[in-house]
Amino acid sequence: MKLVGTCPIHTDRLVLRRWSVDDAQQMYDNLASDTEATRFVTWPPHPNVDATRLLLTGWVRGYDDPDTFNWAVWLDEVIIGQIAVVDVDTRVNLAELGYCLGKRWWNHGYATETVKAVMSYLLDTAKVNKVEDRHDPANIASGRVMENAGMVIEGLRRACVMDSCGPRDSQYHGLLRSEWRGQQADD
């Protein structure tokens, strides 16, 4: 894996770039304070913009490390979401994604577009061997995003994630670099 860090990514409709502490109000308003948008992520909804500012301060500090991959997702000068590598296993060259999109932007293909763009960056530029993601089985829409982005279902891991309701199951999806190359050749 090449430690290339968080570089800007452009798609047809979106810009993915590093977070700034100045993004706190938009992040809070558009996703971090929304109980539905944060229902299946590992962090609780933020009670105020100060909590968002504190989180972003830590994320921005993390950019000093080239193994940090964490993007703000922009549509027409508005922050609509976040995507990051939440775990890396260097033994097998694997990167696990996590993402959150503001509810107003659901069902427009933005999440799939974001995941595809970051997978391309990780597989082609950072040279990971595998990108994976997981979702709560109750979050069917997130599973569809992963499948639409080209990932395949790998299995269910029971009671492996802790949230405010207790232990939860996770459905795993993944894509190998060799599979990615095959998909690109078919396009």
Summary of predicted features, one role per range:
Residues 57-72, 81:
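A short helix-loop-beta-strand connector motif used in the catalytic cores of GNAT acetyltransferases and
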Residues 36-58:
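Conserved GNAT-fold acetyl-CoA-binding loop/helix
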Residues 31, 41, 63-64:
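Hydrophobic residues in alpha-helical segments
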Residues 1-26, 30-35, 70-187:
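Acyl-donor (CoA/ACP) binding surface of acyl/acetyltransferases
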